[in-house]
Regions:
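Hydrophobic packing positions characteristic
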Residues: 2-167
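Intrinsic-disorder/coil detector with helix-boundary
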Residues: 2-7, 157-200
């Protein structure tokens, strides 16, 4: 059988060749956490989109990506400070894939040579958290406000909200603000001063 019979025109052959090369280059994939190692700060993550492949006979198949293991996680940290989160199984994330092998850098830090020549490989993923699909968003009990900076637990509704109006604390038991706390402290200090005056 001639190649032209299998693939059609030369243009189609080149398009298939380009596509086959692209299958080996990975940029980013949404994933779901399967496990989390808090000591190493790595996760095992399952990609949530299947790869579309075309066999030589023209049959289209969708293939599940393998489990990604030892994926470093990205927490916001700088200058000795870090914002961390309690990652758990089922959390979603976006895994991006490095231009080069990150193994030596991950183990030793500083500037390193790659252990092997590979680009955008599934072995060189880094997980970024915060991405969610619409289905999961629709199931959340509480959503962050669009008018403030918030630290929010979407399951309980507990939150710290910072806006132009001030800082507000919301919990399942009560809601208060910084101004209210200061007022209570001042009132408490006034009571202590009054008692000291009476006793003294």
């Amino acid at each position: 059988m001639q190649i032209s019979e299998l693939y059609g025109s030369d243009n189609e052959l080149y398009q298939r060749l380009i596509s086959s090369i692209g299958f080996g280059i990975h940029v980013a994939l949404p994933c779901v956490v399967q496990s989390y190692d808090a000591d190493k700060q790595t996760i095992e993550a399952q990609p949530t989109i299947r790869e579309r492949t075309i066999e030589l006979n023209g049959i289209v198949k969708y293939v599940q990506y393998p489990l990604l293991i030892n994926v470093p996680i990205l927490f916001q940290q700088v200058g000795g400070y870090i914002i961390s989160f309690p990652i758990k199984k089922g959390d979603e994330c976006l895994v991006i894939f490095s231009d080069l092998s990150i193994d030596n850098w991950w183990l030793k830090g500083n500037v390193q040579n790659p252990v092997e020549i590979r680009r955008h490989d599934l072995s060189d993923g880094i997980a970024i958290f915060g991405l969610k699909n619409q289905e999961k968003l629709s199931l959340e009990k509480t959503k962050p406000s669009a008018n403030c900076l918030s630290l929010l637990n979407t399951e309980t509704g507990n939150a710290i909200e910072i806006s132009e109006e001030g800082i507000k604390f919301n919990t399942t038991k009560y809601t208060t603000t910084i101004d209210s706390i200061v007022a209570r402290l001042n009132n408490h200090e006034e009571r202590i001063a009054a008692l000291e005056e009476i006793v003294g």
